[in-house]
Design a protein with these regions (language model features):
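N-terminal lobe of the biotin/lipoate ligase/transferase fold
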Residues: 1-85, 106, 152
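Residue-level signal for inorganic ion chemistry
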Residues: 13, 55, 97, 126, ...
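Active-site metal-binding loops of divalent metal-dependent hydrolases
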Residues: 32-34, 98, 127
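Generic marker of residues within folded, mature protein domains
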Residues: 45-47, 98, 115
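Long, positively charged amphipathic alpha-helical accessory segments at protein N-termini or as interdomain linkers
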Residues: 63-64, 73-90, 100-171
Length: 171
């Protein structure tokens, strides 16, 4: 069963699920913006309102958490596959970055913890969709709209397809 949480603004979708995820459900949290979005090694993730996808999903597992050490790559591949079905050709940079035309378009953050004697995985995904090129970031980046001006982009469809693809990948 899915538990869906939608927010106008959160500090971080990953932090939200780490605090509130139910170990007996698949949980999906989506925010229109994040005030403390982050990537690996606590790098700040720019999260302007209404422009991108900021999502996290969580699930429990009976497996040891160490078995999920490469799940960031599996999750990046899930994002890649969803975009590929829309004729958007991305590349994956190990271990957790998604690139489009040699510029970063997204990232994955995997966090694990134990609650109620169940191991939980939180998969955070940030994907630049409508971000404009006046946003300052410390590396080359792009968004789907900057690269594909004439493409019709439905963020909700992308979110649902990514969530399904990631959860199918864990099986």
């Amino acid at each position: 069963m899915w538990h869906l949480s939608l927010y106008e603004e959160l500090e971080s979708t990953n932090d939200y699920l780490i605090e509130f995820a139910n170990p007996n459900e698949y949980c999906l949290c989506v925010a229109e913006s994040q005030t403390k979005g982050r990537g690996r090694n606590l790098k700040k993730w720019q999260s302007p309102k209404y422009e991108n996808i900021y999502m996290s999903l969580s699930f429990s597992t009976n497996q040891e958490l160490e078995n999920f050490s490469s799940f960031s790559l599996v999750s990046a591949l899930a994002v890649h596959n969803v975009l590929l079905r829309q004729n958007i050709f991305t590349e994956i940079k190990w271990p957790n970055d998604i690139y489009l035309n040699k510029k970063k378009i997204g990232g994955i953050l995997i966090e694990t913890f134990t609650r109620d004697r169940k191991n939980l995985i939180v998969v955070g995904i940030g994907l630049n969709i409508f971000m404009k090129n006046n946003t300052e970031i410390d590396r080359d980046w792009t968004s789907l709209k900057l690269e594909y001006e004439n493409i019709e982009i439905d963020r909700n469809k992308i979110i649902s397809e990514i969530a399904n693809e990631v959860l199918l990948s864990k099986l």
